[in-house]
Amino acid sequence: MIYASKGNFEMACWLILASMILDGLDGRVARLTNTASKFGVEFDSLADVVAFGVAPAMLLYFYIGIDYGRLGACVPAIFVIFGAVRLARFNITTSSEPNFFIGLPIPSAAVVVMLWVLIDLEYKLIENYNYGYVMLLGSFIISILMVSNIRYPSFKKMQWNFKSFIAVILLLGIVYVNPRETLCVLMSGYVVYGILRWLVLIIKVRFSSKLTKDKNT
């Protein structure tokens, strides 16, 4: 948040990514050391609101929102509010690690926003193509996805075998060569996958109900 307010946007972005990595480790460390507690769960949620709600919202505001008046202030505010709602819903509906998430996870939402900023820092899309409104609109859509009922896959219980291990190694190699572009494609693809899967399910349900109705008539 401090780096974003001072205009050091690249460092602010990488710190958000570091927060996501550490967030994936803290629960496992607590279980391995047998130090998991209800207090830890609630405190972790508070940390998530700050790291993945407030921090990316401030990054978004100081990077682009500050130039768009009330609209530029509203979108980051909505991001924080919907992110907090997403975490609250997760805490009351999840008793164990699920195979999927209901709504886009707030860490993923935060990383998508910060990757858009990183890409713009590299290619100057806002400066050259007036990309600002697109970024604000995209961030608003990301906020909506956090509180939606769209299911996103969870990789916490992924079955590790030789093929998956090799795939992860190759993926890490690609990320190492082109970290910004690769991560942006992967995370944006994750967001789009949930939407496409939701649309396919809706089409299947409607088609199935139509077939059933036709058979009954």
Spans of model-derived segments:
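Residues within membrane-spanning alpha-helices of integral membrane proteins
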Residues: 13, 17-20, 52, 76-79, ...
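Hydrophobic transmembrane-helix microenvironments that flank and shape a buried ionizable site
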Residues: 20-23, 41, 45, 80-83, ...
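C-terminal membrane-associated helical module and adjoining short loops/tails
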Residues: 98-217
